[in-house]
């Protein structure tokens, strides 16, 4: 299977970022730098956590990772390659909720505007839309692809 064509296909249909990811420091550090706004709010977007998850990821499972900011990633392995899909959001940005979140984590209110810009750059999608589209894309490339199960990971919520 051509990995680049698969990723382009999924990215174009859903309007979302997708990358193949190796369990090495360089690719995980790069992902963290590009996608993690604040480690205390997104501990599961860090290279350290993604390394742990990749080592323990099971075949035929979509892992939906949700952070404190309510941004989401999906990790899955297909045809001997692991992919990260996202980030994406399910709801519009709420200034009030984010102000409360920042206060509860003892972060300055001055990062609210950059946080809104960060949040608003992601497509608003539902998991069911992503699941159906990605599974159909997989079956386009490898017709006997089995159904994938779902596992939601909410990380270090207290």
Model segments located where?
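Intrinsically disordered, low-complexity terminal regulatory regions
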Residues: 1-33
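Terminal low-complexity "docking" segments
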Residues: 31, 35-45
């Amino acid at each position: 299977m051509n990995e680049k064509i698969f990723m382009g296909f999924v990215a174009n249909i859903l309007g979302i970022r997708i990358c193949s990811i190796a369990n090495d420091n360089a690719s995980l550090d790069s992902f963290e730098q590009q996608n993690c706004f604040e480690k205390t709010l997104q501990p599961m977007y860090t290279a350290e956590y993604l390394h742990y998850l990749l080592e323990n990821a099971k075949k035929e499972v979509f892992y939906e990772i949700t952070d404190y900011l309510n941004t989401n990633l999906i990790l899955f392995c297909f045809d001997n390659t692991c992919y990260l899909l996202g980030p994406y959001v399910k709801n519009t940005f709420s200034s009030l909720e984010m102000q409360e979140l920042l206060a509860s984590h003892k972060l300055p209110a001055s990062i609210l505007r950059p946080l809104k810009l960060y949040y608003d750059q992601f497509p608003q999608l539902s998991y069911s839309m992503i699941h159906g589209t990605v599974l159909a894309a997989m079956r386009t490339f490898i017709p006997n692809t089995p159904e994938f199960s779902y596992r939601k990971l909410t990380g270090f919520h207290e």
